[in-house]
Design a protein with these regions (language model features):
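Short, Lys/Arg-rich flexible segments
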Residues: 1-84, 107-173
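Mid-chain, well-packed structural core segment of small domains
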Residues: 74-103
């Protein structure tokens, strides 16, 4: 699934962002803002997850890395997009056994039958991640904007202090 979000009125933020000369500083600022915005989304999804054994809720997290298989699929989907920073929220195999069946809980399964024709049941959908995203999306965008603004201000101030310190060091005999 591909989503496109347009945010209006961020020219001031863009101008401040361009004041960061080093691309690594820009990426680090964006990564920190996304991480701080992703934490509450992961917590909300975890609280909405079905609690049969509790392992599904424990497996929900956030991060910048995907599994090898997911990374290959992601590269194919977004081959032409050159995004500077990405953050992913969802169930992880590495964080608990519940991550392996998260998609089945979220979307459900159709009716299942043995080869003999005997009906063995189905899993009805119990969505937890999509409702969490739907309820937190607007707040998340505001959080990203506020976090980016604060982090950029700190980074610019730090760079200005560093430049002043170097200038004072070069002027002094």
């Amino acid at each position: 699934m591909r989503a496109s979000i347009t945010i209006d009125g961020l020219q001031d933020l863009q101008q401040e962002f361009e004041r960061l000369e080093n691309p690594r500083q820009r990426k680090a600022s964006a990564r920190r803002a996304l991480r701080n915005a992703a934490k509450p989304l992961a917590a909300l999804a975890s609280s909405m997850a079905p609690r049969a054994s509790g392992s599904l809720a424990a497996s929900i997290g956030y991060g910048t890395r995907l599994s090898k298989r997911q990374a290959g699929i992601h590269r194919k989907m977004f081959r032409d997009d050159r995004v500077a920073v990405e953050m992913f929220v969802g169930a992880s195999y590495a964080m608990g056994g519940g991550g392996r069946h998260a998609h089945l809980q979220e979307f459900g399964t159709g009716p299942r039958y043995h080869k003999s024709g005997k009906y063995v049941g189905q899993v009805s959908p119990q969505p937890f991640l999509r409702p969490a995203w739907d309820s937190y999306q607007a707040t998340m965008l505001d959080t990203i904007k506020a976090e980016l603004w604060a982090d950029i201000q700190k980074s610019v101030a730090r760079a200005e202090r560093r430049a002043a310190r170097l200038a004072a060091k070069n002027v002094a005999p």
